[in-house]
Regions:
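Catalytic beta-strand-to-alpha-helix segment of the class III nucleotidyl cyclase homology domain
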Residues: 63, 67, 83-200
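Short coil-to-helix leader/linker segments, especially the first N-terminal amphipathic alpha-helix
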Residues: 2-16
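Short low-complexity stretches enriched in small and charged residues
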Residues: 9-10, 38-41, 73-77, 114-118, ...
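Short acidic/polar alpha-helix capping motifs at helix-coil junctions
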Residues: 3-4, 28, 153
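Intrinsically disordered, low-complexity glycine/proline-rich and charged
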Residues: 1-5, 196-201
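Catalytic NTP-binding/metal-coordinating core of nucleotidyl cyclase/transferase enzymes
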Residues: 14-102
Length: 201
């Protein structure tokens, strides 16, 4: 490869980096993933139509509760899962508690178990924004993958947090009464090492 070709590659690479930086910005956010546990079993038990109706009600409920948080934003919905971001870890926990309390009440009312598992993590990510609205269009980076892995470890009706949002939210919510939440308990599972992540969470 001659020097001229190398120079052209370098120029192209620099232009790609500049274009990426023009469309993206780095930011520290509280990341939240949630999905319905055993959604396939739900479809097998009640049939596709009833399961789809339940999932639609679930999605409407998620968006209704999210509307109570001015600093929360839906990034993506896929199937029965949501990717949401918040400015504060405490808001992510409040949102999660309200969602699960509503799901418990709904499941008891209709006799159809629909439970979420939720993962929360804080990290610096690359934010792609809508040019007109100034809202996040998509998020990229290792921290997004890490949050998804935290969520994947959860069980039905469980909220899992990595260390920083756990400590931050627990302190911020200390002594605060949450509507519809009788008792709030925090359980420290200790550090957990995930595949592909250097430091334990």
């Amino acid at each position: 490869m001659v020097a001229g070709e190398l120079q052209q590659i370098a120029i192209k690479r620099r232009a790609e980096v500049e274009e990426f930086q023009r469309k993206h910005r780095a930011g520290l956010l509280t990341l939240l993933f949630t999905d319905i546990v055993d959604s396939a079993k739900l479809k097998q038990t009640f049939g596709d139509r009833e399961a789809v109706i339940a999932i639609q009600h679930h999605h409407a409920m998620i968006r209704e509760i999210l509307g109570q948080f001015s600093e929360g934003e839906e990034i993506e919905t896929a199937g029965d899962s949501f990717f949401i971001v918040f400015t504060k870890p405490s808001d992510a926990v409040k949102f999660s508690l309200l969602v699960q309390a509503r799901l418990r009440a709904l499941s008891a009312e209709v006799g159809r178990p629909v439970f979420d598992r939720i993962g929360i993590h804080v990290g610096e990510v690359w934010i792609e924004e809508h040019e007109s609205a100034g809202k996040a269009q998509d998020l990229y980076g290792l921290q997004v993958d890490t949050c998804a892995r935290v969520q994947s470890l959860g069980q039905a009706d469980q909220i899992l947090l990595s260390r920083f949002p756990f400590d931050s939210a627990r302190q911020a919510l200390k002594g605060e009464e949450l509507p519809g939440i009788e008792a709030l308990s925090w359980l420290n599972h200790g550090p957990y090492r995930m595949k592909g992540v250097e430091e334990p969470l």
